[in-house]
From Swiss-Prot:
Binding residues annotated for [4Fe-4S] cluster, in chain numbering: 122, 160
Species the sequence originates in: Escherichia coli (strain K12)
Summary of subunit composition and partner proteins: Homodimer.
SUPFAM superfamilies tied to this protein: Actin-like ATPase domain (SSF53067)
Keywords of this entry: 4Fe-4S, Iron, Iron-sulfur, Metal-binding
Protein name per Swiss-Prot or TrEMBL: Uncharacterized protein YjiL
Gene Ontology MF annotations: 4 iron, 4 sulfur cluster binding; metal ion binding
Length: 255
């Protein structure tokens, strides 16, 4: 059996995938620690434990160059495109929103990379932004869908993390319900993301990946602003790691 491991060392989370003859058989997910290399090592040891042969290891993400035992290192753009096509073969565009960056990837009919945009200069519109506002209002990102269900969003004027946090506090003091503020934040983020995607004139189907893709409220609001379907997948957060594992699988097959 041919084994390939892909590890995506992100700024917020470290994700790992084991492919066995092209099938996902193991997953690994932990928050990225102060020393990302320790999470990469843990992922490698956990995913390969008990295997009869040593897997091919491909690293991607911010921390991909922090260890010296990988067989290959690949940029996250290539990996996210491949991972998206693995999860949803018809995908023509990927919107990935992680902890501290967001990216849009445009693919052709064959799944090849056409173009991409990346925003890693500002926390607005990222998982970190959503996390800060959620914590300010006494909840967590994991609870957003249930809290904001059937809630009318309150207008949010600032998308700067610092100013938006102050605005959320002011609105709460003025008596605005926290769930309405949170729905407003999600709506503002979705609108910003839609404008970002529109810069590439992307075609459907679109796959939404990254940690924020778990928020179905965000996905539905993004659909509304884009006026086209936005798909999600239970393994969407692992797209980068999946793509890395696919690359490793291809390299091993050619040998």
């Amino acid at each position: 059996m041919a084994y390939s491991i892909g590890i995506d060392s992100g700024s917020t989370a470290t994700k790992g995938i084991l492919l066995a003859d092209g099938v996902i058989t193991r997953r690994f997910l932990v928050p990225t620690p102060f020393r990302p290399a320790t999470a990469i090592t843990e992922a490698w040891e956990t995913l390969r434990e008990g295997l009869e042969t040593t897997p091919f290891l491909t690293l991607t993400g911010y921390g991909r160059q922090l260890v010296d035992f990988a067989d290959k290192q690949v940029t996250e753009i290539s990996c996210h495109g491949l991972g998206a096509r693995f999860l949803a073969p018809a995908t023509r565009a990927v919107i990935d929103i992680g902890g501290q960056d967001s990216k849009v990837i445009q693919l052709d009919d064959d799944g090849n990379l056409c173009d991409f945009l990346m925003n890693d200069k500002c926390a607005a519109g990222t998982g970190r932004f959503l996390e800060v506002i959620s914590r300010t209002l006494g909840t967590s990102v994991e609870q957003l869908d249930s809290i904001t269900e059937n809630v009318t969003p309150h207008a949010i004027t600032s998308m700067c993390t610092v100013f938006a946090e102050s605005e959320a506090i002011s609105l709460r003091s003025a008596g605005v319900a926290p769930e309405a503020i949170l729905a407003g934040v999600i709506n503002a983020m979705a609108r910003r993301s839609a404008n970002f995607i529109a810069r590439l004139s992307c075609e459907a189907p679109i796959l939404f990946t990254g940690g924020v893709s778990h928020c179905q409220k965000f996905a539905r609001m993004l659909e509304s602003h884009l006026r086209m379907p936005v798909n999600t997948h239970p393994d969407a957060q692992f797209a980068g790691a999946i793509g890395a594992a696919v690359i490793g699988q291809r390299v091993r097959t050619r040998r």
